[in-house]
From Swiss-Prot:
Gene name of this polypeptide: ilvC
Entry keyword annotation includes Magnesium: yes
Organism name: Frankia casuarinae (strain DSM 45818 / CECT 9043 / HFP020203 / CcI3)
EC id: 1.1.1.86
Highest taxon listed in the record's lineage: Bacteria
Protein name: Ketol-acid reductoisomerase (NADP(+))
Length: 329
């Protein structure tokens, strides 16, 4: 069973004499910085001089420096920019100031898991990864609650890395809900698999295939859109709130019977075998190597595939129908 830590298991006193730098001010960066600040932590934000986020961070009362300046000052450096920017930011702005006794932290394990960043000996390396978007992390913190987080320690040079990670998690509100102990490897591999096989890749491909099947059979594209894309949120919300069984309890008997008898015909053993291949590519590093090479080469295939996706008929149909929906238009 997973170890779960709560407020009583963490102490902000661990951070009392430490300076924290949050590098980045996007979805997670702004939530981490503001929550830490409101928890009494000495925090500064690291942003390039030309970053459009500097004004926003300053308006919200935060001290803003360049990533290099923030890293030089800080005892704990949390890197919360997109994965593909980490290597450059680390090499240019963090590594020169990452001396023994400091800690390097992440919100996702990708660059450590695949060896793209190799911190020096004498440095703690940990992860605090909220299981929710930054705006939710900030909002529930202000409500006196928290979003669950994953906590991992990759390097414990000080012998106190877990306590520091838990203190950080408490500072952003994570231990109010619960901090689940994991590893960089587990977090990275499961996160990538979920994105590729289920949440993003799997879901979008399933929706498009269902839409295409109905339209090719002669059904109206607008009705196909409602049945295969629009109503997906209704079902996902039920699953989100109470699990698959609660969703099945909430739908009609006809829908439930179709679920349990036809669903396995869609997700067949062959589909699961392909899922295992995707997982193998994640575990052996093939996906990471492919993505890093694609990014380093200017993203030609990525750009092409995204552009092609935008031309799918379901996008045009959705653009026509969504203005009818006052709650989202």
């Amino acid at each position: 069973m997973v170890e779960i830590y709560y407020d009583d298991d963490a102490s902000l006193d661990v951070l009392a004499d430490r300076k924290v730098a949050v590098i980045g001010y996007g979805s997670q960066g702004h939530a981490h910085a503001l929550n830490l600040r409101d928890s009494g932590v000495d925090v500064r934000v690291g942003l390039p001089a030309d970053s459009r986020s500097r004004a926003r961070a300053e308006e919200e009362g935060l001290r803003v420096l360049t990533p290099a300046e923030a890293s030089a000052e800080a005892d704990i450096i949390m890197l919360l920019t997109p994965d593909t920017t980490h290597r450059t930011i680390y090499a240019e702005s963090i590594a020169p100031h990452l001396t023994a006794g400091k800690a390097l932290a992440f919100g996702h394990g990708f660059n450590i898991r695949y060896g793209l960043i190799e911190p020096p000996a004498g440095v703690d390396v940990f992860m605090v990864a909220p299981k929710g978007p930054g705006h939710l992390v900030r909002r529930v913190f202000e409500e006196g609650k928290g979003v669950p987080v994953l906590v991992a320690v990759e390097a414990d040079a000080s012998g106190n890395a877990l306590a520091v990670a838990l203190a950080y998690a408490k500072g952003i509100g994570g231990t109010r809900a619960g901090a689940l102990r994991t590893t960089f490897t587990e977090e990275t591999e499961t996160d990538l698999f979920g994105e590729q096989a289920v949440l993003c890749g799997g879901a979008s491909a399933l929706v498009q295939a269902g839409f295409e099947t109905l339209v090719e059979a002669g059904y109206t594209p607008e009705v196909a859109y409602f049945e295969c894309l629009h109503e997906l949120k209704l079902i996902v919300d039920l699953m989100y709130e109470g699990g698959i069984s609660q969703m099945r309890y909430s739908i009609s008997d006809t829908a439930e019977y179709g679920d349990v008898t036809r669903g396995p015909r869609v997700i067949t053993p062959a589909v699961k075998a392909e899922m295992r291949k995707i997982l193998d590519e994640i575990r052996d590093g093939a996906f990471a190597r492919e993505w890093v090479a694609e990014d380093d080469n200017g993203r030609p295939n990525f750009t092409k595939l995204v552009a092609e996706g935008k031309q799918h008929p379901i996008e045009q149909v959705g653009a026509k129908l969504r203005p009818m929906m006052s709650w989202i238009a």
